[in-house]
Design a protein with these regions (language model features):
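Extreme N-terminal starter segment of soluble prokaryotic enzymes
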Residues: 1-4
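Hydrophobic residues at beta-strand termini and immediately following loops
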Residues: 6, 106, 218, 249, ...
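Short polar catalytic/cofactor-binding loops
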Residues: 7-12
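Cys-nucleophile CN-hydrolase/nitrilase-fold catalytic domain and related Cys-dependent amidase chemistry
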Residues: 14, 23-104, 114, 186-213
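Short amphipathic alpha-helices and their capping/turn segments at secondary-structure boundaries
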Residues: 18-32, 165-174
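Structural motif
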Residues: 34-35, 146-148, 178-179
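CN hydrolase (nitrilase-like) catalytic-core segments centered on the catalytic cysteine
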Residues: 55-75, 157-255
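Active-site catalytic loop in hydrolytic enzyme cores
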Residues: 84-175, 193-199, 260-261
Length: 261
């Protein structure tokens, strides 16, 4: 299954983010990809108090666009869900097939300060979430489906977080996961950049090696608050397999890549 990744700017302007994601969809279509992965909060922007009406309209536009273009999407966005307990804000990866049909949703488990206002995934009650990514009606070269587990930012970096289960280990133990889809949006431009770079790189390499499950990961090119930034992303975007990077894109500005799983 050919999956593309988009290293793109994530601003607080939902309409601008929509345009950016559509351009990435176009790139993925031009490169005969089955699906596309976007960074954490790539549609909504990384602000829990997003404009709800604007976001609802933007998501509808994206869903219509992927159906028109016949490509799947793993969309990082904040979202307000209607659940049994009421309306709840979540940090999500929304998985779609190439007809614009939603296949499932991963909610972020290990929240950070930037997620203020969002509710964490109830791991104890609902367990790890596995999604079957697939293409409908359109035959493209290669595998047409794959079982994926979404890991949102700290859900991967927080592997082995004190007192908390490792989500990658839970996915491995399930025996159902073929791929980790990692959407992230990390801090950058601070005194900890060097050590954070090593931390992120080590996790992406070691988890892919220890679990023998590939990882596709994409990061935001802006600051977490959506402000422009001309330095490197907080982590590398690309694919790791068995402890090695098998794709390579610069960590500056908008970049796209794909890999055949």
């Amino acid at each position: 299954m050919r999956i593309a990744g988009a290293q793109i700017p994530v601003t607080l302007d939902i309409k601008e983010n929509t345009k950016t994601i559509k351009k990435s969809i176009d790139w993925a279509v031009e490169n005969n990809c089955h699906s596309l992965v976007t960074p954490e909060a790539s549609l909504s922007g990384y602000d829990s108090y997003f404009d709800e009406d604007t976001l609802v309209n933007a998501l509808a536009e994206i869903e219509e666009y992927i159906a028109e273009k016949q490509i799947g999407l793993c969309l990082g966005t904040l979202w307000k869900e209607k659940e049994e307990i009421g309306e709840v804000r979540r940090n999500q990866i929304r998985f779609y097939d190439n007809l614009g049909k939603i296949l499932g949703v991963t909610n972020k488990t290990y929240l950070v300060n930037q997620d203020n206002g969002c509710l964490a995934h109830e791991l104890d009650d609902k367990g790890i979430q596995v999604h079957n990514l697939r293409c409908q009606k359109v035959q493209k070269v290669g595998k047409q489906q794959i079982n994926a587990v979404g890991l949102i930012c700290n859900d991967l970096w927080g592997n082995g977080w004190p007192g908390k289960p490792s989500l990658s280990n839970l996915a491995l133990q399930s025996g159902l996961c073929d791929l980790f889809v990692h959407s992230t949006n990390g801090a950058r431009g601070n005194p900890h950049d060097e050590i954070y770079n090593k931390w992120h790189d080590a996790h992406l390499l070691m988890i892919s090696q220890a679990t023998q499950i590939p990882i596709i990961t994409v990061d935001n090119t802006c600051h977490m608050n959506g402000h422009p930034y001309d330095g490197p992303t907080s982590s590398e975007s690309g694919v790791t397999v068995d402890g090695k990077w098998v794709t390579k894109v610069p960590r500056l500005g908008t970049q796209h890549f794909y890999y055949d799983f």
